[in-house]
Amino acid sequence: MQLFSILNELILVPILKLKILTMQKHLFLGVEAIGQGAIDGGMSGVYSYPGTPSTEITEFIQENQIAEERNIHRKWSANEKTALETALGMSYAGKRAMSCMKHVGLNVAADIFVNAAMTGVNGGLVVTVADDPSMHSSQNEQDSRFYGKFAMIPVLEPSSQQEAYDMARDGFALSELTKVPVMLRITTRLAHSRAGVARKDVLPENELVMPTDPRQFILLPAIARRKYKGLLESQSLFLKLSEESEYNRYEEGTDHSLGIVACGIAYNYLMEHFPGGTCPFSVVKVSQYPLPENYINRLDQECDEILVLEEGAPMVEEMLKGFFSNGTPIKGRLDGTLPRDGELNPDIVAKALGKEMFEGFDIPDVVANRPPALCVGCGHQDAYLAMNEALADYSKGRVFSDIGCYTLGALPPYETISSCVDMGASITMAKGAADAGLIPAVAMIGDSTFAHSGITGLLDAVNEKSSITIVISDNESISMTGGQDSSAYGRIESICIGVGVDPAHIHTIVPLKKNHEEMVRLFREEFAYNGVSVIIPRRECIQRASSRKRNKK
C-alpha cells in the first residue's frame, strides 16, 4: 500500500497535473504561443539571436518551468547564422530544434537556411522567422515567404495565436515527415497581440539517433546533385500535404462575383468583418505553403475575380497572375486595391471589400513630434558628444554606424552618424570609405553587433592596415532588444588583440561627463593615427543597471 502511495505521488499526480494544465486555455502573445508550442512539441533546443519581433519566443522558453526541468538548450547565439547551424547540428543528432530570428536575420542565415533544405534533417527542425511590415523596428519589410519558396521547403503562416501554438508544436513532426526544415513565418501584429490558446499534451523529446545515411550532411557536388533532385521530387509531397492540411481550407460563399485568397493573419482581418463567421464570398484560407492548388483552381472556376489578402509582399498575388490561364482579374497590392507597402489591418481590408472605413482624425499641429531618443544617462550620449567635438576640425559624413540603440545618434542633438545599413556594416563601410580617400573614417558599433558581424570586417581592416578608428560602444548587453547578454561580454579587447590590432591603439574609457576631455583627447589622437585603432567607451546600459538595482531591493 505504501509503495502504491509513493508511485502515485511520483508518477500519477504529476501526469494528472500536467493533463489539467494542458487542458486549460492560456492568454498568450503570439510569440509566447510559439514558445509553448515548441516546448510541448518535444523540442530539445532553441537557438536564436535577439531581434524584434521574435525576441520573446526565446525569452519565454528561457523562463519556462518545463524547459528548465527538461534542461532544454535555450542560450542566445552570436548571430542568426550560428544559431541555425547549431540547430541543424542538434537535428543531425536526432533531436528536435528550433531557430528563431527576425526577417533581416534570415539574410544573415541564408547560406545555412538554403543548404539545410538540401541536406535535409534527422530530428525535426523549425525555423521561426518574424517579419516586420511597416518597419516598426527594422531596416526593411522584406517577406520571408520568398526565402521559403526559394529554398523549396514547407512554410507555415498562422492566422491566429492558436494556430501559432499548433504549428510550433506540430511543425517538428511535419519536418520529420518531409525530411526538410520547416519555416514558421509570423508578423509583428500576431507576435505581439494576445488571444486564448488551448494547449495539447506535452510530447517527449526524441532520443539521440544518428542519421541512417552517413553522407546525408555532406554536400560535395556529386552528393549535392543527388540531394537536389530528391528535393525537387519531394515538391509533389509538399503540395499534397498542403492540399490536405487542416490549416488550409475552402469556405464556400453564395456571392461568386468575388473570390478571396486570405493568407495568414489576413484571414483574421477578413473575418473581423463577418462576426457570424460566414463571409458571402468564397474564401481560400492559406496558412501552409506551397499554395493549395486544388482550392485555388476551384476558386478560379467559381468566381469572377480574385482578391488576394496577404501580409507583406504580393507573393501569392504574383504567383496567381501566372497560375490562372483564363485571365481571371486579380486584385491586391499590385493593382492598388491594397497599399503596396506597410501593414494590413481590418480597416484596409474593409476598404478593399467596399465597406466603409473609419479614416481617423488628423494629428493637431500643437502636438509635437516625439521621435525615439537615447535614454537619459545613456553612455552613448557621452561618446557622441566627445566624438562630435573631436571631429569638429574635419568635414561631415565620416561616421559609419551600425544597428543598435546608438543608431539614434543620427537624430538631434547629435547628428553624428551618416549610415546605418546592416549588422556589421559600420566597420566595412568605414574601411571602404578610407580606401576611397576619406581619412579619417570612423565606425560606430555596439558590443553585441561587433560579436555578431563586426569581427571579420575588423580582420579585413587589420590585414590592409586601413586608416580607420573603430568605436565599440560597450553597454555590456544587447540593450535594444531588452538587455540580453552579449556574446562579446568581457572579451572585446582580447578579440581585437587576437585579430591583430596593435594593443597600443586599443583604449577603454568610461563614457561619463567627468571623462569628456579625456575622451576628446583619445578620439583626436586616434583619428590622426595612420592605421587601425579601437576605442571602447564602456558603461553598463542605464536601463539594465536600473533594473538590476531594483531587483536587488
What are the roles of these predicted feature ranges?
Residues L10, P14, K19-V31, G41, ...:
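Flexible, low-complexity linker and terminal segments
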Residues P14, K19-Q161, R189, G253, A410-V534, I542-R550, ...:
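Thiamine diphosphate
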Residues Q62-A67, M271-V283, S494-D502:
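Short helix-loop-beta junction
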Residues C100-M101, V126-A130, M183-T187, V261-A262, ...:
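Short beta-strand segments
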Residues A109, H136-S138, H192-A195, N268-E272, ...:
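Short helix/loop capping segments that flank catalytic or ligand/cofactor-binding pockets
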Residues Q142-F146, A198-L203, G276-G277, G322-S325, ...:
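Short secondary-structure boundary/capping segments
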